[in-house]
Structure formats: C-alpha cells, structure tokens
Amino acid sequence: MRISSRFTIAVHMLTAMEYFKGQYKITSEFLASSVCTNPVVIRRLLGKLKEANLIKVSRGTGGAVLTRDATLITLYDIYQAVEEDDADGALFIFHEHPEPLCPVGSCIHEVLDPKLDSIKLALINEMKATTLAELVNKAQTINLAKSNSN
C-alpha cells in the first residue's frame, strides 16, 4: 500500500465534481485549473475513476459526474481506484539489510512490524470511514466561514 499524489489529486477532483455539481460543466480542463496540473494528468485519473465505476464521463466536452451519491464513496474506494497494487502491500519501506549481528538490527522487524501493521490497518479503517460527502461538506463550511469573515 503506497500512497502517491494520484490519490490526493483524485480526491481533489471528486470533491470538486461534487462541490460544483450543477454549477459548472466538469471537464478535465476545469479540474486541471482547480488542481493546478496538466489536463493530461486529470484525464488519466478520470480514466481510472471511470474504470472503477466511481464516475461517468460524457464524450467530447460533456463533462464528468459521480455514478453514486457522495455519501457512498469513501477515501478507500478512491485509493483503490487510482493507486497501483504493490506486491507486498507494505505502507512503510524498510531498509533492506539491517546488520544481523547487531542487537537492534537483528530484531528490528520483530520490534517494528507489528506496530507498522497496526498503523496501516488504522489508516485503512479511517479511509473506509471517511466519505466524499464529508470532504465536500467541510469545504463548503470552510468557504462559508471565509466569506462571512470578509
């Protein structure tokens, strides 16, 4: 389990799609301007999100929409859609050759692996518990507070 910028960009994209639903046509150019990246990056991720059945994309400049309610899309769904599955599923990358004759190096995996596994499980559970709707609501709340303070 490795988490790249593909994940945070995809979360940004889907949050924007829901946030601006009905106000703007959600195109790759529109999303690229929000993310501040090249539309090609956005189109690649749109393809992965479509493959995972999280979005529907209309041909041409028809735009993209979510295929289900934002309350039913979790961060873990998005992660699974855009991140490559690595062979070992490790979140943390260990240095390859700890010194086997060192009292610490010889047992560092036994010391640290259970804790790292717990951390990974907690991360996955938090991702599964966090919905896209929560993120959209938070963005709306923040923007409302900003507009009220001006």
Where are the model-predicted features located?
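Conserved segment of winged-helix/HTH DNA-binding domains
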Residues: 70-96
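Beta-hairpin "wing" of winged helix-turn-helix
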Residues: 52-61, 65-67
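A short alpha-helical element within helix-turn-helix/winged-helix DNA-binding domains
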Residues: 26-36
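Basic amphipathic alpha-helical segments that dock to polyanions
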Residues: 46-50
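C-terminal regulatory/oligomerization modules of transcriptional regulators
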Residues: 91-150
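Short coil turns linking two alpha-helices in DNA-binding domains
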Residues: 38-41
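Short amphipathic alpha-helical interface segments
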Residues: 13-22
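Short alpha-helical segments that sit at the start of domains
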Residues: 1-14
